[in-house]
């Protein structure tokens, strides 16, 4: 919903997203910021409800694209930089692979001789499943 964006412009954005197939994206609703060129030169002429509708459409499409991308990683092995404990389960750790995708995996696997990992460690993981935002992994 940038100033002056038409429905055709918005559809073009969705079309580019489909064509490129981004793994992930940072998506925000436009809001005027004092002192910027846009605030000085362009009237904020897109209604808030329309900005929200367009953003929700972009987010829904990106969630589909991210899930497709993450599904292609199932079965692959990655070296992951551990960031710390998972927010959902303290027995799990989370970190990012070299492709910047978030991975969640057991912090320790005693039966495999894999000790507890901590932030800053590198661990090898294999992707078992995924969501649109996360690769669910096992330590290898």
Identify the meaning behind each predicted range.
Residues 38-140:
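Terminal RNA-binding accessory module
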Residues 1-36, 57-65:
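Conserved C-terminal portion of the radical SAM core fold
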């Amino acid at each position: 919903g940038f100033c002056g964006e038409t429905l055709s412009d918005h559809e073009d954005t969705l079309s580019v997203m489909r064509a490129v197939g981004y793994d992930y994206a940072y998506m925000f609703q436009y809001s005027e910021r004092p002192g910027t060129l846009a605030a000085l030169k362009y009237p904020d002429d897109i209604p808030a409800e329309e900005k929200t509708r367009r953003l929700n459409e972009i987010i829904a499409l990106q969630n589909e694209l991210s899930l497709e991308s993450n599904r292609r990683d199932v079965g692959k092995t990655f070296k992951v930089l551990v960031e710390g404990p998972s927010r959902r389960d303290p027995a799990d750790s989370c970190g990012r692979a070299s492709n910047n995708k978030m991975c969640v995996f057991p912090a320790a696997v005693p039966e495999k001789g894999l000790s507890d990992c901590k932030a800053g460690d590198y661990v090898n993981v294999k992707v078992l499943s995924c969501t649109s935002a996360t690769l669910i992994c096992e330590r290898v």
